[in-house]
Amino acid sequence: VHDPSDLAGVRLRVQQSPINVHLAEALGAIAVPLPFPQLAEALRAREIDAQENALANVAGLALWESQRYLIATRHALSAHVVLANAEILAALGSGAAIVRDALRDALAEQRSETERLENELRDELAQRMILIELDAAARDRFVAATRLVHDRVARALGDDAIARVLAASVAARPAPSPE
Protein backbone atom coordinates (compact mmCIF):
# COMPACT_ATOMS: atom_id res chain seq x y z
CA VAL A 1 0.00 0.00 0.00
CA HIS A 2 1.65 3.17 -1.23
CA ASP A 3 -1.43 5.12 -2.29
CA PRO A 4 -5.08 5.29 -1.16
CA SER A 5 -6.09 3.61 -4.42
CA ASP A 6 -4.18 0.51 -3.25
CA LEU A 7 -6.85 0.02 -0.57
CA ALA A 8 -9.73 -0.32 -3.04
CA GLY A 9 -11.74 -3.37 -2.00
CA VAL A 10 -9.41 -4.31 0.87
CA ARG A 11 -11.30 -5.61 3.92
CA LEU A 12 -9.73 -3.40 6.57
CA ARG A 13 -10.32 -4.02 10.26
CA VAL A 14 -11.00 -0.75 12.04
CA GLN A 15 -11.94 0.21 15.56
CA GLN A 16 -15.66 0.17 16.28
CA SER A 17 -16.02 3.90 15.80
CA PRO A 18 -17.99 5.73 13.11
CA ILE A 19 -15.09 8.05 12.32
CA ASN A 20 -12.74 5.08 11.74
CA VAL A 21 -15.32 3.47 9.47
CA HIS A 22 -15.67 6.73 7.50
CA LEU A 23 -11.88 7.08 7.21
CA ALA A 24 -11.48 3.54 5.84
CA GLU A 25 -14.31 4.04 3.37
CA ALA A 26 -12.85 7.38 2.22
CA LEU A 27 -9.69 5.47 1.33
CA GLY A 28 -11.71 2.97 -0.72
CA ALA A 29 -11.38 0.11 1.75
CA ILE A 30 -14.21 -2.05 3.01
CA ALA A 31 -14.39 -1.10 6.69
CA VAL A 32 -14.80 -4.07 9.03
CA PRO A 33 -15.45 -2.79 12.56
CA LEU A 34 -14.18 -5.56 14.81
CA PRO A 35 -13.37 -5.77 18.52
CA PHE A 36 -9.62 -5.75 19.10
CA PRO A 37 -9.52 -9.17 20.83
CA GLN A 38 -10.89 -10.77 17.63
CA LEU A 39 -8.28 -9.21 15.34
CA ALA A 40 -5.57 -11.89 15.26
CA GLU A 41 -8.04 -14.70 14.60
CA ALA A 42 -9.81 -12.68 11.88
CA LEU A 43 -6.46 -12.20 10.11
CA ARG A 44 -5.57 -15.89 10.42
CA ALA A 45 -8.99 -16.92 9.11
CA ARG A 46 -8.66 -14.38 6.24
CA GLU A 47 -11.94 -12.73 7.29
CA ILE A 48 -10.07 -9.45 6.88
CA ASP A 49 -7.19 -8.53 4.61
CA ALA A 50 -5.53 -5.87 6.72
CA GLN A 51 -5.76 -3.90 9.93
CA GLU A 52 -4.77 -0.50 11.28
CA ASN A 53 -3.24 -0.30 14.72
CA ALA A 54 -0.48 1.27 16.71
CA LEU A 55 2.86 -0.54 16.58
CA ALA A 56 2.44 -1.60 20.22
CA ASN A 57 -0.79 -3.40 19.28
CA VAL A 58 0.83 -5.08 16.28
CA ALA A 59 3.67 -6.32 18.50
CA GLY A 60 1.38 -7.25 21.39
CA LEU A 61 -0.72 -9.56 19.23
CA ALA A 62 2.30 -10.94 17.32
CA LEU A 63 0.55 -10.00 14.08
CA TRP A 64 3.65 -10.94 12.10
CA GLU A 65 2.31 -14.49 12.43
CA SER A 66 -0.64 -13.62 10.20
CA GLN A 67 0.48 -10.71 8.04
CA ARG A 68 3.67 -10.13 6.11
CA TYR A 69 3.67 -6.40 5.56
CA LEU A 70 3.70 -3.43 7.89
CA ILE A 71 2.92 -0.14 6.20
CA ALA A 72 3.99 2.77 8.41
CA THR A 73 1.42 5.38 7.45
CA ARG A 74 1.73 7.46 10.62
CA HIS A 75 -1.89 8.38 10.04
CA ALA A 76 -2.99 8.79 13.64
CA LEU A 77 -1.86 10.52 16.77
CA SER A 78 -3.09 9.19 20.07
CA ALA A 79 -3.22 12.39 22.02
CA HIS A 80 -3.58 12.66 25.75
CA VAL A 81 -5.91 15.43 26.81
CA VAL A 82 -5.47 17.17 30.13
CA LEU A 83 -8.46 19.07 31.44
CA ALA A 84 -8.66 21.35 34.44
CA ASN A 85 -11.45 23.29 36.08
CA ALA A 86 -10.79 26.96 35.25
CA GLU A 87 -12.03 28.17 38.63
CA ILE A 88 -9.80 25.79 40.57
CA LEU A 89 -6.82 26.64 38.39
CA ALA A 90 -7.46 30.37 38.90
CA ALA A 91 -7.70 29.79 42.66
CA LEU A 92 -4.12 28.54 42.60
CA GLY A 93 -2.94 32.05 41.81
CA SER A 94 0.76 32.02 40.93
CA GLY A 95 0.73 28.26 41.56
CA ALA A 96 -1.20 27.83 38.30
CA ALA A 97 1.96 28.71 36.37
CA ILE A 98 3.85 26.00 38.25
CA VAL A 99 1.16 23.47 37.33
CA ARG A 100 1.22 24.55 33.67
CA ASP A 101 5.03 24.39 33.53
CA ALA A 102 5.09 20.94 35.14
CA LEU A 103 2.43 19.73 32.74
CA ARG A 104 4.32 21.11 29.72
CA ASP A 105 7.49 19.34 30.92
CA ALA A 106 5.64 16.07 31.57
CA LEU A 107 4.00 16.14 28.14
CA ALA A 108 7.35 16.81 26.44
CA GLU A 109 8.87 13.86 28.31
CA GLN A 110 5.91 11.64 27.41
CA ARG A 111 6.23 12.54 23.72
CA SER A 112 9.96 11.87 23.79
CA GLU A 113 9.49 8.50 25.49
CA THR A 114 6.67 7.56 23.11
CA GLU A 115 8.87 8.39 20.12
CA ARG A 116 11.73 6.32 21.57
CA LEU A 117 9.45 3.32 22.17
CA GLU A 118 7.88 3.66 18.70
CA ASN A 119 11.34 3.62 17.11
CA GLU A 120 12.31 0.51 19.11
CA LEU A 121 9.08 -1.25 18.11
CA ARG A 122 9.52 -0.25 14.46
CA ASP A 123 13.03 -1.76 14.47
CA GLU A 124 11.83 -4.95 16.18
CA LEU A 125 8.86 -5.37 13.84
CA ALA A 126 11.10 -4.75 10.80
CA GLN A 127 12.97 -7.92 11.80
CA ARG A 128 9.75 -9.95 11.55
CA MET A 129 7.79 -8.19 8.81
CA ILE A 130 8.41 -6.32 5.59
CA LEU A 131 8.29 -2.69 6.73
CA ILE A 132 7.28 -0.06 4.22
CA GLU A 133 7.65 3.58 5.29
CA LEU A 134 5.53 6.02 3.32
CA ASP A 135 7.23 9.22 2.26
CA ALA A 136 5.71 12.66 2.85
CA ALA A 137 4.14 12.81 -0.63
CA ALA A 138 2.35 9.49 -0.08
CA ARG A 139 1.14 10.58 3.36
CA ASP A 140 -0.19 13.79 1.78
CA ARG A 141 -2.24 11.70 -0.67
CA PHE A 142 -3.82 9.86 2.28
CA VAL A 143 -4.62 13.18 3.97
CA ALA A 144 -6.23 14.47 0.77
CA ALA A 145 -8.29 11.28 0.39
CA THR A 146 -9.69 11.65 3.89
CA ARG A 147 -10.45 15.38 3.67
CA LEU A 148 -14.18 14.64 3.25
CA VAL A 149 -14.17 12.96 6.67
CA HIS A 150 -12.76 16.17 8.17
CA ASP A 151 -15.55 18.08 6.41
CA ARG A 152 -18.19 15.66 7.76
CA VAL A 153 -16.88 16.06 11.31
CA ALA A 154 -16.77 19.84 10.85
CA ARG A 155 -20.45 19.83 9.84
CA ALA A 156 -21.32 17.80 12.93
CA LEU A 157 -19.17 19.69 15.45
CA GLY A 158 -18.72 23.05 13.78
CA ASP A 159 -15.86 24.43 11.73
CA ASP A 160 -14.24 26.04 14.77
CA ALA A 161 -14.10 22.75 16.68
CA ILE A 162 -12.41 20.83 13.86
CA ALA A 163 -10.01 23.73 13.24
CA ARG A 164 -8.97 23.70 16.91
CA VAL A 165 -8.50 19.92 16.90
CA LEU A 166 -6.39 20.04 13.74
CA ALA A 167 -4.31 22.93 15.09
CA ALA A 168 -3.71 21.05 18.35
CA SER A 169 -2.75 17.95 16.36
CA VAL A 170 -0.21 19.88 14.31
CA ALA A 171 1.20 21.53 17.43
CA ALA A 172 1.57 18.18 19.20
CA ARG A 173 3.09 16.35 16.25
CA PRO A 174 6.80 15.65 16.60
CA ALA A 175 9.10 17.15 14.01
CA PRO A 176 9.26 14.97 10.87
CA SER A 177 12.21 12.67 10.55
CA PRO A 178 14.57 13.35 7.64
CA GLU A 179 13.75 11.34 4.54
Regions found by a protein language model. Give the residues of each.
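N-terminal secretory/targeting leader peptides
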Residues: 1-179
